[in-house]
């Protein structure tokens, strides 16, 4: 599943490519039953469409479940699509987080507010020490932003948490997170 999904998401298997269950069975040395399960998973993600006489056809990205964590991971893992995926996730993040923060300011419990302040202090300390590109920083940053989304009290915003977290993890994993934060970032 990961090899095929990654191949489709990276563009190695371009839109319109056709393959069959037999092709999957032969290529990966798997049974038709397992190949059928892979086909169903790819279909559910919108990456392929099946047709009786044709087989499986790779679909355009507009058909994909682009917020699914598997699709995000496959796009991040590919050098061909990583930059576009990070840009898309960053844009989603900048669109959703200000609204989430405003709603969190209105709806957060006292415990959530206290936890956010404590995490903000920890982020400032780690970032000022030039360690904003470490797993320690990432762990606190993910918890901080996840709590903001949760505290918004809006189930639709909360449902986007994993997508927002993906860009944060991607920036650190692929060396795009600066070690030292700007003053503006420390006080966000």
Which residue stretches match the model-derived regions?
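Short linear motifs at protein or domain termini
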Residues: 1-95, 102, 106
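Short, hydrophobic secondary-structure boundary micro-motifs
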Residues: 16-17, 51, 158-161, 177
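A short, mixed-charge helix-start or loop-turn motif at secondary-structure junctions
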Residues: 21, 78-83, 126-130, 174-178
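Conserved amphipathic alpha-helical segments that form helical-bundle/coiled-coil interaction surfaces
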Residues: 89-174
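Short, intrinsically disordered, charge-balanced linker/junction segments flanking boundaries
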Residues: 176-188
């Amino acid at each position: 599943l990961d090899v095929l999904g990654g191949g489709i998401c990276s563009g190695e298997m371009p839109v319109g490519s056709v393959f069959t269950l037999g092709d999957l069975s032969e290529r990966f040395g798997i049974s038709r039953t397992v190949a059928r399960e892979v086909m169903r998973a790819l279909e559910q993600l919108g990456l392929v469409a099946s047709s009786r006489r044709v087989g499986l056809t790779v679909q355009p990205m507009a058909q994909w479940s682009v917020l699914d964590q598997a699709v995000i991971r496959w796009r991040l893992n590919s050098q061909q699509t990583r930059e576009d995926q990070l840009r898309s996730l960053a844009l989603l993040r900048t669109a959703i987080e200000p609204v989430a923060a405003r709603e969190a300011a209105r709806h957060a419990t006292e415990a959530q507010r206290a936890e956010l302040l404590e995490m903000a202090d920890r982020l400032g300390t780690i970032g000022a020490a030039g360690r904003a590109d470490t797993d320690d920083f990432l762990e606190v940053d993910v918890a901080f932003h996840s709590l903001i989304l949760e505290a918004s009290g809006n189930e639709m915003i909360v449902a986007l948490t994993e997508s927002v977290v993906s860009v944060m993890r991607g920036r650190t994993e692929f060396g795009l997170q600066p070690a030292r934060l700007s003053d503006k970032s420390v006080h966000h």
